[in-house]
Curated annotation (Swiss-Prot):
Record InterPro entries: Aerotolerance_reg_N, UPF0353, UPF0353/GerABKA_families, VWF_A, vWFA_dom_sf
Membrane topology, record value: Multi-pass membrane protein
Organism the protein comes from: Mycolicibacterium paratuberculosis (strain ATCC BAA-968 / K-10) (Mycobacterium paratuberculosis)
Gene3D superfamilies, A to Z: von Willebrand factor, type A domain
Signal peptide: none
Domain VWFA residues, every copy: 98-294
Keyword Transmembrane helix: yes
SUPFAM superfamilies: vWA-like (SSF53300)
Keyword Cytoplasm: no
Stored PROSITE patterns: VWFA
Stored NCBIfam families: PRK13685.1 (NF010238)
Listed name of the protein: UPF0353 protein MAP_3435c
Keyword tags: Cell membrane, Membrane, Transmembrane, Transmembrane helix
């Protein structure tokens, strides 16, 4: 839970739970207060002139006199919770990661079922993804048709990546496995440079395609898509896939209209092998939404952060309220 002006309020992940032993002192304060109230009443009844007492003392003492002590006890509980060091999940931008954008440029990407055509829409959404991705992440670009080409090695230069995306042109065949292997090689190369003492940076492949692989025909062949996915799994690289298009896509080839329906099965299997996530998009807007989701997933990591400030501020406010209530109601500090 996150409160305005205060930040996250968490009751989990305490770093110093032994501070809760201080709550025993709070219980002691409450107990002493109760005992004091009973003792005070007995003293009054023992030594006071009852006729005078009945005339000057209110028949029922105001319950508001207990408010300062209640607030004091509450503030001590809040401050103790702050001292125990609660934590909450915090999303922080990644500053050393590699993302490879692998885009299918086979001739089926010229289908106009997604206006103006699949490839043009992919270009626009891909450039938006490049702009939105956390600036410190190294982004690379691979295109694949019959073969795969590393157009832009992983870099933080977004202009270079967008220029590479603009250069994409349709070509025959679909060699999905080649695209994945090329991306893995680029990841390995930049990892050897960036690794250092911290080891290779975390990496992710984002694979966008509209159809099943046809080079080779068997995805389990040495250069096939499933073989490449298993290689990615072995390297600890997740592959997120985007199947892009509709079941009604067509392209014109030598005077004939050829159906090119989108195929989800191959890409879903690649995700299963690598423990990645599969997406489907059938319009430019939905493709942009998918890329935005990926950007939020890839560009940040979740870590445990300190969440004691909210408890500290609440405790301070309640403590100030206890002091003020004591002065206004009882004409003394709460005790």
């Amino acid at each position: 839970m996150k409160l305005p002006l205060l930040g996250p309020v968490s009751v989990t992940g305490f770093q110093n739970p032994w501070f809760f032993l201080a709550l025993l002192a709070v219980l002691l304060v409450i107990g002493l207060y109760v005992v004091q109230q009973f003792a005070r009443r007995r003293r009054v009844l023992r030594f006071a002139n009852m006729e005078v007492l009945e005339r000057v003392a209110p028949p029922h003492p105001s319950r508001w006199r207990h408010v300062p002590t209640i607030l004091l006890a509450t503030s001590l509980v809040l401050l103790t919770t702050a001292m125990a060091g609660p934590t909450s999940d915090v999303r922080i931008p990644l500053n050393r990661a590699v993302v490879m954008l692998v885009i299918d440029v086979s001739e089926s990407m010229a289908s106009t079922d997604v206006p103006p055509n699949r490839l043009a829409a992919a270009k626009e959404a891909g450039k938006q993804f490049a702009d939105q991705l956390t600036p410190a992440i190294n982004l690379g670009l691979v295109e694949f048709a019959a073969n795969a080409t590393l157009l832009v090695p992983p870099t933080t230069n977004r202009a270079a990546v967008k220029a590479g995306i603009d250069s994409l042109q349709p070509a025959p065949k679909t060699a999905t496995g080649e695209g994945i292997f090329t991306a893995l090689q680029a990841i390995a190369t930049v990892g050897s440079v960036m690794g250092g003492g911290e080891g290779p940076p975390p990496a992710r492949i984002v694979l966008e395609s509209d159809g099943a692989e046809n080079v080779p025909l068997d995805p389990n062949a040495p250069q096939g898509a499933f073989t490449a996915a298993r290689a990615a799994k072995a390297e600890g690289v997740q592959i997120s896939t985007i199947s892009f298009g509709t079941p009604y896509g067509t392209v014109d080839y030598e005077g004939a209209t050829i159906p090119v329906p989108v195929d989800d099965q191959t890409l879903q299997k690649i995700c299963e092998i690598t423990d990645g996530q599969a997406f489907h998009a059938d319009s430019l807007d939905s493709l942009k939404n998918v890329y935005s989701t990926l950007q939020r997933q890839i560009g940040y990591e979740t870590v445990k952060g300190d969440a004691s400030m909210a408890w500290m501020l609440l405790g301070a406010v309640v403590l100030a309220g206890a002091v003020l209530a004591g002065l206004l109601l009882n004409r003394r500090l709460p005790a």
